[in-house]
């Protein structure tokens, strides 16, 4: 029950990445309106679901715009390649972006452009965690003929290239996607194991 807001984002087939901005005043409005679920449908890349609790926490902990960056990448480590045999693999990150102050331009130079006159100092901060909250992510995936959907999991690849099979990840036949809870910025993909893997709570890594 409650209000659900879905924002569709169309992505060109030629693009390997997307940057989606949730403005601070829009976040305020979502929280004050009591939206139970806010979903960013990033077309062929992934769906991102924010609960009201997550929206509230982001609103409490940040003062600028929230920027969601999704970039298609290729893993390079041998272990990561073994776990994620089939694309897509995404570098998913959340950022806070805000204008710290306006920069006053003096007349030391003639013919300032309008862009230069409006120049601002912008501060970008990568959100390394969500303060105990999560974002639900669904990565579209079509199982191969020899793959059992029950053996599909989301995989997190850490900074050293080590893959970690994510707790509470699974294939959702209705969404035709592998779903999991996102807790921190990083590299994510879809992995397959015929035998049940050792799942990891990436919050502790």
Where in the sequence are the language-model features?
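Short, solvent-exposed secondary-structure boundary motifs
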Residues: 20-22, 55-62, 157-163
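Short, T/G/N/S-enriched strand-turn elements that build extracellular solenoid repeat scaffolds
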Residues: 1, 18-30
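Low-complexity, acidic Ser/Thr/Pro-rich repeat tracts that form intrinsically disordered stalk/linker regions
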Residues: 1-11
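A generic structural signal for beta-strand entry/edge sites
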Residues: 2-4, 17, 35-37, 65, ...
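Self-processing/autoproteolytic domain segments and adjacent N-terminal interaction modules in large
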Residues: 28-130
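Solvent-exposed, low-complexity segments and loops of surface/extracellular structural proteins
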Residues: 10-15, 23, 33, 83
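Proteolytic cleavage junctions
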Residues: 100-205
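Helix N-terminus capping/helix-initiation residues
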Residues: 23-25, 49-51, 172
